Amino acid sequence: MLMPKRVKYRKQQRGHNRGMAHRGNTVAFGEYGLMALEATWMTSRQIEAARRAISHHVKRGGKIWIRIFPDKPVTAKPAETRMGSGKGAVDHYVAVIKPGRILFELAGVRPEVAHEALERAAQKLPIKCKIVPREDLEGAA
């Protein structure tokens, strides 16, 4: 599972997830990317399930980049516990996803294989996604 090695502060407030992604919204490393179309908190388990789906489909070929990392701690209190007596312990970590964010990238495989692998990954995720090709900058030399 993905989680930070060490953190400055153990617990965080929830915050608001508004607006579009301004960072990480272009395919930077691979040839194809999986773009989020909705806002969500994505758990490390969901990210791992999607990664496994891609890896299983491309077998030994290709390279996968995971462009998101779960660095936000989510706390939970034990079941059947009365309210009060402080904030609960850290239960798991999530990545905050905004619309337009590239989640995974893939390179080194045929276009139809990449498309199918990313579609299988998208089915494992709690949001709608779309597959985007890399847009190489024209005339940038």
UniProtKB/Swiss-Prot annotation:
This is Large ribosomal subunit protein uL16. It comes from the Bacteria. Pfam families: Ribosomal_L16 (PF00252). Part of the 50S ribosomal subunit. Keywords: Ribonucleoprotein, Ribosomal protein, RNA-binding, rRNA-binding, tRNA-binding. The gene is rplP. Residues 1-21 are annotated as: Disordered. GO terms for cellular component: cytosolic large ribosomal subunit. Binds 23S rRNA and is also seen to make contacts with the A and possibly P site tRNAs. InterPro entries: Ribosomal_uL16, Ribosomal_uL16_bact-type, Ribosomal_uL16_CS, Ribosomal_uL16_dom, Ribosomal_uL16_sf. Belongs to the universal ribosomal protein uL16 family. GO terms for biological process: translation. PANTHER family: 50S/60S RIBOSOMAL PROTEIN L16, LARGE RIBOSOMAL SUBUNIT PROTEIN UL16M. GO terms for molecular function: rRNA binding; structural constituent of ribosome; tRNA binding.
